[in-house]
Amino acid sequence: MYDWFKQMRKESPVYYDGKVWNLFKYEDCKMVLNDHKRFSSNLTGYNDKLEMLRSGKVFFDIPTRYTMLTSDPPLHDELRNLTADAFNPSNLPVDFVREVTVKLLSELDEEFDVIESFAIPLPILVISKMLGINPDVKKVKDWSDLVALRLGRADEIFSIGRKYLELISFSKKELDSRKGKEIVDLTGKIANSNLSELEKEGYFILLMIAGNETTTNLIGNAIEDFTLYNSWDYVREKGALKAVEEALRFSPPVMRTIRVTKEKVKIRDQVIDEGELVRVWIASANRDEEVFKDPDSFIPDRTPNPHLSFGSGIHLCLGAPLARLEARIALEEFAKKFRVKEIVKKEKIDNEVLNGYRKLVVRVERA
C-alpha cells in the first residue's frame, strides 16, 4: 500500500474514487484535520446500511456515534473537557502501568504471541482501572473488536447481536450504579454529568474500547519494527520515547480517518462540493517526502517527527498521553527482559482502517 501512497502523492494528491475524496499529502491532511469548521466529524446519515445488508453485512448502531469523535463544537468541547484532566500526563497512573507491564512480562516463556499475551491485556487492564470496572480482558477485547470493526457477516448476526446487547447492558449497569454517588472514577464522572443517557453510554464505551484497540496495535507494530530494523539496543540505551514516535509514524495504528465538507472547498486544483466525504490518509501523510527525510526508513531517534498518527486540531486524540506512556513503559520493560531472536508467525488485521496484528508470535531469550 505504501507504494500506492507514494504514487498518489506524486500523481494525484487529491483523488476522487467515485464515492469519496482521498488526500495523500501531509499538508492537505493536516489542513483538513485542523479545520473543523469546513470539515466536520459528524458523519450522521453517511452510513449506507442498505448497501451493507445487500452485500451480506449487518451494521449495528452502537452509541459511540454520540461522542467527541463524531461531534463538532460546542458539544465536542463539552464532551472532551469532561474527562480531559484524567488524561493529563501528570495525572496518569504511571506506577500501575509499570506494575501491570512487569507482571505480564513475568508470565511469558521463550515463545509467545505478543498480541494475545501482552499487547491486548495491558491497555485493557489500565483503562479498566481508570474506569473503575472489573477487568475482564476477553469480554472487553470482544467488545472492542465489535465496535472497531462495526461490521459482521450475516451468518454471524446472532453472536454479534448478543455481544452488542451485552456491551450496552454492561455500560448501563456501570453508569447506573454510580448515579448520585461520590465520584471516584471516570465512570462516576460520566454518570453524574449533564449528558443525555445515549451520550453517557457512548462516552463510557468510547473510553473503554477506543484506546485499547489502537494501543494494542501500537505495541505490536513497535515490537515488529524494533526487531526488523535492529532498534532494540537503541531502546535499551536511550529509552523508548523517540522510538515510540517513530513507530507511530512508520506503522500508524490507524491508517486513515474521514471528514465531511460543510461547504464547497478547494484543495489544490480540485473543487469539492458541500456534503462530500473526504478520506484523510494518515499513513501516507506520515511518509511524505516533503516533510520527512528518508521517510521509508525506520529511524528510532528521528527528530523532529511531526507525524499525524494521533490526529491534529480539536480532535487530537484525548488518550494520546496514555497511549504514549503505555507503549514507552511496555517497550522499555520488554527490552530489559528479552532479546527477540525471531518473529515466528504473524497475521495482520484484515481492516482498511486499523493497522496492526491479530497474531505476532516471537521467540526470545533473556536479556
Swiss-Prot record:
Any GO MF annotation of the entry: monooxygenase activity
InterPro entries: CYP450_119-like, Cyt_P450, Cyt_P450_B, Cyt_P450_CS, Cyt_P450_sf
Ranges that cross the membrane: none
Entry binding sites for heme: 76, 80, 257, 259, 315, 317
Enzyme Commission number, as recorded: 1.14.-.-
One GO cellular component, as annotated: cytoplasm
Family recorded in the similarity comment: Belongs to the cytochrome P450 family.
Organism listed in the record: Sulfurisphaera tokodaii (strain DSM 16993 / JCM 10545 / NBRC 100140 / 7) (Sulfolobus tokodaii)
Notes on temperature effects: Active up to 80 degrees Celsius. Thermostable.
Keywords assigned: Cytoplasm, Heme, Iron, Metal-binding, Monooxygenase, Oxidoreductase
Full protein name: Cytochrome P450 119
Location of this chain's protein in the cell: Cytoplasm
Name of the top EC class for this enzyme: oxidoreductase
A Pfam cross-reference name: p450
Keyword check for Transferase: no
Bound cofactor: record note: Binds 1 heme group per subunit.
Required cofactor(s): heme
